Amino acid sequence: MTSLCLTIAPAVLSLICLSSYGWAEDNNGIHTLDDGDNDPFFRHNRQFYRFGRAFVPLWDNADDSLVRKNLLTHWSEFPLSPALSSSDVFSRNSRQFYRFGRSYPPYQDKRFLRFGRSHQPDIDEYLQALNSDQALYRKRRSEDGDSKEDGLNRVARSADANQQSKNTQSNKFGKDLQKRETKKEKLNANDDLEILSNEDDLEKKFMRFGKRFMRFGRGDEDESYDKRFMRFGKSLRHDQEFEKRFMRFGKRFMRFGRGDEDDAREEKRFLRFGKSSNEDEDIKKRFMRFGKSGNEDGDVDKRFMRFGKRFMRFGKSEKEDGDVDKRFMRFGKRFMRFGRGDSETS
């Protein structure tokens, strides 16, 4: 217990000494300002943080909450606001504000939250305004003092000035910058996207991504020129290679339509739903068919969807044979019969 007390006592004494030292430093700063420091603001340190507008004696603000009357000093270089007395100067606590950067003029940049150094080319105007005895706030112009005749004269002077400025610009820049009206015939001719004679102008009609671009339209150029585009449409050149009319992804492509070529090997690449134009039974067996075959032969069962050698048959066979049970759906050797045969079995 004794060792614990001996440890706590020096720590408490150290805290008391530090707080006393800080209080003494604050008082020294206040006395330094009272002795004649040329700083209109009370600050513990110039590296303070500030958000908001700085309250300086250059602007009119009669807010008594910001006036620290117990810490007033006189700074003769800045003119005081008429709303306050000649002995009022403002003090400011550094903890109320947050500032990032260095302040260049102490009366303008402190209104803003700044990141960096201020650069103001019109600093001479502010210095001239500070050194003058005129009021730094703008007075509202009274409308009662203006007569009707003064208003008419002012409007006439402004109209003459505008006309003179237009004439000066016209003489200076010439006729190139004057407003020119577009004829109606030109507007109507440019509405439709007609193919121009120049090949360079033809490419300007489309949306381009570098040298290769997507084209949504038709062109009269050769077929090798069309292969660079993703095309949604029909080429004007009707050649025998009809596959190039459609959207292509490499050598194999999806075709939505019917070709005029009766080539069986070409049809093998497609998933076909419908009739085949070629009357070849071997070609029909390659597809999953939902329809009727064009070839009316005796084997009517091939009209249906087949799964291997066994198939589901939904219909009636045209061949009336003794084996009536084959007309129905069969599952293995035993089958389910939905109907009645023509021959009465015992």
From Swiss-Prot:
Positions of the UniProt region annotated as Disordered: 137-185
Biased composition (Basic and acidic residues): 141-152, 173-185
Subcellular location: Secreted
Composition bias, Polar residues: 160-172
GO BP, sorted A to Z: neuropeptide signaling pathway
Alphabetical UniProt keywords: Amidation, Cleavage on pair of basic residues, Neuropeptide, Repeat, Secreted, Signal
Entry keyword ATP-binding: no
Tissue: Central nervous system.
GO cellular-component term (any): extracellular region
Signal peptide: 1-19
Sequence positions bearing Phenylalanine amide: F51, F100, F115, F209, F216, F232, F249, F256, F273, F290, F307, F314, F331, F338
Propeptide section residues: 20-45, 54-94, 103-109, 118-203, 219-226, 235-243, 259-267, 276-283, 293-301, 317-325, 341-346
Main subcellular localisation: secreted
General function of this protein: Can function as both cardioregulatory hormones and transmitters and may regulate cardiovascular function.
Record-given protein name: FMRFamide-related peptides type HF-1
Organism: Cornu aspersum
